């Protein structure tokens, strides 16, 4: 007998953990490297490299020289 999300077992005891969610299986196989993650990683790498070049042009020093001057 089911009433608003509760279920009674054969001894008429309340069992509110008896309703289980529907289980599904995703058939697509994906490891940690997805296309979206690779695109984002590439974009951030390009932004970082461009920032490095801009900093070198503006300061006139390379990264190693700039870090040594700190």
Swiss-Prot record:
Localisation per UniProt entry: Cellular thylakoid membrane
Induction, as annotated: Transcription strongly induced in the absence of photosystem I (PSI), probably a monocistronic operon. Mildly increased translation in the absence of PSI (at protein level). Expressed at very low levels during growth under normal light (40 umol photons/m(2)/s), induced under high light (500 umol photons/m(2)/s for 6 hours) with maximal expression by 1 hour and decreasing after, after growth at 4 degrees Celsius for 6 hours, less induced after nitrogen or sulfur deprivation (at protein level). Upon return to normal light protein levels drop rapidly.
Alphabetical UniProt keywords: Membrane, Photosynthesis, Photosystem II, Pigment, Stress response, Thylakoid, Transmembrane, Transmembrane helix
Topology within the bilayer: Single-pass membrane protein
UniProt cross-references to InterPro entries, sorted A to Z: Chloroa_b-bind
Keyword Ligase: no
One GO MF term: pigment binding
Membrane-spanning parts: 31-58
Reported phenotype of the disruption mutant: Single deletion mutant and double hliA-hliB deletions are out-competed by wild-type in high light (500 umol photons/m(2)/s). Quadruple hliA-hliB-hliC-hliD deletions die rapidly in high light but grow normally in normal light (40 umol photons/m(2)/s). Quadruple mutants are sensitive to norflurazon. In a quintuple hliA-hliB-hliC-hliD-hemH deletion chlorophyll half-life decreases 2-fold while the half-life of PSII proteins does not change; photosystem II assembly intermediate RC47(1) is missing (RC47(1) is PSII monomer without CP43). De novo chlorophyll synthesis is very slow.
Signal peptide: none
UniProt topological domain (Lumenal, thylakoid) ranges: 59-70
Example of a GO biological process term: photosystem II assembly
Annotated Gene Ontology cellular component terms: photosystem II; plasma membrane-derived thylakoid membrane; thylakoid membrane
Family the entry assigns: Belongs to the Hlip family.
Name of the featured protein: High light-inducible protein HliA
Organism: Synechocystis sp. (strain ATCC 27184 / PCC 6803 / Kazusa)
